[in-house]
Design a protein with these regions (language model features):
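Alpha-helical transmembrane segments of integral membrane proteins
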Residues: 2-4, 90-127, 143, 168-307
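Transmembrane alpha-helical core residues of multi-pass small-molecule transporters
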Residues: 11, 19, 42, 107-108, ...
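Hydrophobic alpha-helical transmembrane segments of membrane transport/permease proteins
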Residues: 16-65, 80, 84, 158-174
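Juxtamembrane/transmembrane-helix interface segments of polytopic membrane transporters
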Residues: 19, 23-27, 147, 151, ...
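Membrane-water interface segments at the C-terminal ends of transmembrane alpha-helices
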Residues: 23-29, 66-68, 133-162, 180-184, ...
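Hydrophobic aliphatic residues
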Residues: 26, 30, 38-42, 70-71, ...
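An internal, D/E-rich "acidic patch" concept
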Residues: 56-113
Length: 307
């Protein structure tokens, strides 16, 4: 198991370096610059700003300088929000985004797995049909559709929850964004659990257990559930990536001060360092959670770690 873990951990650093390098050159080579929207600037003032931020240097030198600063934990200053460094903005937004993402994933697991189990145990019944219909609907509707719909129903018509904004410690501001972000993941986890559990029910060792008179629920909890959850565990990594990308839309729709909203603002304003900082944060989170999913999968399935 340790060798398997070291092998997985060793792949994280070069992957992160590729993400940093690709993001740096894509951002810098994109049309426009951080000061192009400021029409009142004279050419001399703009040249002075470029020199102050090192944007007048060749892109290869800018890249080397950025890596050197990054090695010391310095993400650089924000070009647009000049009173803040990128580290300050990450420190402000990361707790909000982390709480949003972790809660959405936890909600998806706590709801999606029981729904999938119920649909598999009572397959081809009205319960199965109802769950399957909701699953298809949840997968089909993207966050930028479900978010405004939920805000319209529960925020405007019923006035149960706020439709936007953020107050520290106020859970009611978190309900609609978390549900919006979690719904597609709940649907996919439920579908994956149902199909995987039905496959396990058709396996030879389950048939043997039934022939020996083992009860239905003992077969489910004692024999079938653990192997059926292996595909669900492997999906946690892609689900994390989905939640990360989905948070960009959700935080913008509901006005949450998270890293996703800062990333969107940075991309619009061509704030190079802010975009890079947020991309690195998101890339690191996705890689670490994928690593965690791989380790859990290897612990559950010995065949994987011995390959």
């Amino acid at each position: 198991m340790l060798r398997y873990a070291f092998r997985r951990i060793a792949g994280v650093i070069p992957t992160l370096l590729v993400i940093i390098t690709a993001s740096f050159f894509i951002v810098r080579l994109a049309p426009g610059g951080p000061f192009d929207q400021e029409q009142t600037l004279s050419p001399q003032v703009r040249a002075n700003l470029d020199a102050a931020y090192g944007l007048d240097r060749p892109i290869a030198i800018q890249y080397c300088r950025y890596l050197r600063a990054l090695a010391h934990g310095d993400f650089g200053p924000s070009f647009k929000q000049r009173d803040f460094s990128v580290t300050d903005l990450i420190a402000q937004g990361l707790p909000v985004s982390s709480a949003l993402g972790i809660t959405a994933i936890a909600l998806a697991i706590l709801i999606g797995i029981p729904l999938g189990i119920a649909a598999a145990v009572w397959k081809q019944t009205p319960l199965d049909v109802g769950i399957t219909s909701l699953v298809v609907l949840g997968i089909a509707l993207p966050g930028f559709v479900t978010g405004p719909l939920l805000a319209l129903v529960f925020g405007v018509y019923l006035q149960w929850l706020p439709v936007a904004g953020w107050e520290d410690g106020a859970a009611r501001y978190f309900v609609l964004p978390v549900v919006t972000l979690a719904l597609p993941v709940i649907a996919y986890v439920a579908r994956l659990t149902r199909s995987s559990l039905l496959d396990v029910f058709r396996a030879n060792f389950i048939r043997t257990a039934r022939a020996r008179g083992v009860g239905r629920w003992r077969i489910l909890w004692g024999h079938a559930l653990r192997p059926a959850l292996l595909p669900v565990v492997s999906y946690i990594g892609p689900a994390t990536a989905f939640v990360v990308t989905g948070s960009l839309v959700v935080e913008t729709v509901f006005g949450l001060p998270g890293t996703g909203r800062y990333l969107v603002q940075g991309a619009i304003n061509r704030d190079y360092t802010l975009v890079m900082g947020m991309v690195i944060v998101y890339g690191t989170l996705v890689l670490l959670l994928n690593l965690l999913a791989d380790l859990v999968y290897g612990w559950l399935d010995p065949r994987v770690r011995h390959e």
